[in-house]
Amino acid sequence: MSSTFRAPAGAATVFTADQKIRLGRLDALRSSHSVFLGRYGRGGVPVPPSASSSSSSPIQAVSTPAKPETATKRSKVEIIKEKSNFIRYPLNEELLTEAPNVNESAVQLIKFHGSYQQYNREERGGRSYSFMLRTKNPSGKVPNQLYLTMDDLADEFGIGTLRLTTRQTFQLHGVLKQNLKTVMSSIIKNMGSTLGACGDLNRNVLAPAAPYVKKDYLFAQETADNIAALLSPQSGFYYDMWVDGEQFMTAEPPEVVKARNDNSHGTNFVDSPEPIYGTQFLPRKFKVAVTVPTDNSVDLLTNDIGVVVVSDENGEPQGFNIYVGGGMGRTHRMESTFARLAEPIGYVPKEDILYAVKAIVVTQREHGRRDDRKYSRMKYLISSWGIEKFRDVVEQYYGKKFEPSRELPEWEFKSYLGWHEQGDGAWFCGLHVDSGRVGGIMKKTLREVIEKYKIDVRITPNQNIVLCDIKTEWKRPITTVLAQAGLLQPEFVDPLNQTAMACPAFPLCPLAITEAERGIPSILKRVRAMFEKVGLDYDESVVIRVTGCPNGCARPYMAELGLVGDGPNSYQVWLGGTPNLTQIARSFMDKVKVHDLEKVCEPLFYHWKLERQTKESFGEYTTRMGFEKLKELIDTYKGVSQ
């Protein structure tokens, strides 16, 4: 796994003097309580089973051989996955009970199916359980039929709202257990999926939501689709559970099938229904984003893998720069956990991208820690090993050397709000949605427009929505009806709101410590009032992100001003991100009560206005000044009239 979590002799990856990697035999797959499925490990090496195979028996992990007595223990989730018969048991039994909830093992497994069990934390008495469903939409693409289906499901089986997420998907809250199969099957039968939207596997693959008819944008979105297909589970557990085994999958591109099946460098589990994942899947969640030069709408460096299209002087895509090791989650006051930006690993030709991505995923699969989930993301493996060692190991699975990264221009955050020409005679319209929550008159009007004009939509990584393929003659009536529902053009939306994000937090998220989505409207109004008080112009802005806990779902550690839940009605304040999302923030103050935000922020905004350099953003200013000086400015601040 990692440098502190070793496989047994004969199965471990071994570094020789010249740093080559020897992928040895997987020995001794034995367990007193489980059965190994099949007769082969990685690369087709025979492995003796401890008992005869049985499709109904718990399954020994192909990728995790039985450990000797001295081996590091595995987390309980690893044991649950091992015994689940490829993410089926005991979820399949729990769904049939009369109880409104499922047991602990099933809670972990249903994540792989795209759902979290929740309850309303503000209700007293017994817990009223429900389930949140999350769709999987590579590049944020939502066909017209799927949007209308999700809109219907929210009203009939949810809480009457849809939520657009920071990974370009829908979240549907409030689904009762008894309705799960109906809702899931409806999504599947209407061009959607929730498979892998949660759980220890590749999540939704991001790409710019703009439907430009440009070679690099189209290629980025095609690549995102192909990576999503490559890393999608193959064992059928999802369709078995929700549509009785009926397959609703489109034909995969041949290059995806070829890359998945290729085992030239010992990446696959031979004869396993999960050739890439095995029975243990990945140690933790895994996130991928694809984009084009300059377009950082996807928060590229926060992903486990970031992929950037590189084109020649004629605009023809030639290959990709790849970044590895980003991730946001951390734990308060536990310095061994941290947010981290991805770093360059190299360049690959366009025909090799699926093989390179697969090699990176397999490196994490084989070496990521499985004993302590706090340290199981790939960022900790790379931080432990260093990028050079990580690259060496990946290259053994890739079968080639990475080329030097190509030089790229500066990044920009692109929101795609407002009207834009697609390049094919049609238009697209980006609409700001506060915290991604679509409800009320906004929801009703969006449905009417999308249904009337048969529009496909896309979800952005900033929780907004894009209406696609709009004819010129439709622009005026669509603009008018949207404005009447509060879906305004960007010139009428506060610049602070346009870049702000928040996670759902209370009342349904089990990890929330304090408010986020429900708290951010007031926070943004107070920041605007502070701007006015210190003399900052209306068109000036600061990237503000709010989360209810330190797990970082709204990527607060990239914000210029990040507020991270740190107790009831209090936040940890983070400063130092940049508007183009290329610099990570740092923790500035702990446990700042929400009613004390003016005491902290107003002096900083005031001195930023007075002391900033030309075009210096708030995040750049706070980094240049340093935290010691900033705290001094807060302590000595006597108001605007000083």
Curated annotation (Swiss-Prot):
SUPFAM superfamilies, per database record: Nitrite and sulphite reductase 4Fe-4S domain-like, Nitrite/Sulfite reductase N-terminal domain-like
This protein's UniProt keywords: 4Fe-4S, Chloroplast, DNA-binding, Heme, Iron, Iron-sulfur, Metal-binding, Oxidoreductase, Plastid, Thioether bond, Transit peptide
Gene Ontology biological-process annotations: negative regulation of DNA-templated transcription; response to cold; sulfide oxidation; sulfur compound metabolic process
InterPro entries from the UniProt entry: NiRdtase/SiRdtase_haem-b_fer (IPR005117), Nit/Sulf_reduc_fer-like_dom_sf (IPR036136), NO2/SO3_Rdtase_4Fe4S_dom (IPR006067), NO2/SO3_Rdtase_4Fe4S_prot (IPR045169), NO2/SO3_Rdtase_4Fe4S_sf (IPR045854), NO2/SO3_Rdtase_FeS/sirohaem_BS (IPR006066), SiR_ferredoxin-dep (IPR011787)
GO cellular component: apoplast; chloroplast; chloroplast envelope; chloroplast nucleoid; chloroplast stroma; plasma membrane; plastid; stromule
UniProt modification remark: Phosphorylated; this phosphorylation reduces DNA-binding.
Family assignment from sequence similarity: Belongs to the nitrite and sulfite reductase 4Fe-4S domain family.
Protein name: Assimilatory sulfite reductase (ferredoxin), chloroplastic
Organism expressing this protein natively: Arabidopsis thaliana (Mouse-ear cress)
Gene assigned in the entry: SIR
